[in-house]
From Swiss-Prot:
Record-linked Gene3D superfamilies: Ribosomal protein L31
Species of origin: Bacteroides thetaiotaomicron (strain ATCC 29148 / DSM 2079 / JCM 5827 / CCUG 10774 / NCTC 10582 / VPI-5482 / E50)
A biological process term (GO) from this entry: translation
Protein name: Large ribosomal subunit protein bL31B
Subunit structure: Part of the 50S ribosomal subunit.
Highest taxon in the source lineage: Bacteria
Pfam families: Ribosomal_L31
Length: 84
């Protein structure tokens, strides 16, 4: 490998799916301030909104996943308007 080409902070990080609570360990260069104990070790923690364990494409369930409240925000702005 060439020196100075690859990131120095490539390390194991725990990713936590906030929609269902599942966690998995993977290597990443992401900068985080939170840590968590996972399988007896302490790792940096990155919270994500959706992962393969909760995404409708991978689970086969067709449900509306709206963690950011985008539908509610749209309906509050434009849902009550009627054409006259």
């Amino acid at each position: 490998m060439k020196k100075g080409l690859h990131p120095e902070s490539y390390r194991p990080v725990v990713f936590k799916d906030m929609s269902n609570g599942d966690m998995f360990l993977s290597k990443s260069t992401v900068a985080t301030k939170e840590t968590i104990e996972f399988e007896g070790e302490t790792y940096p923690l990155l919270k994500i909104e959706i992962s393969n364990t909760s995404h409708p494409f991978y689970t086969g369930k067709s449900t509306l996943v709206d963690t950011a409240g985008r539908v509610d925000k749209f309906m509050s702005r434009y849902g009550d308007r009627k054409k006259k």
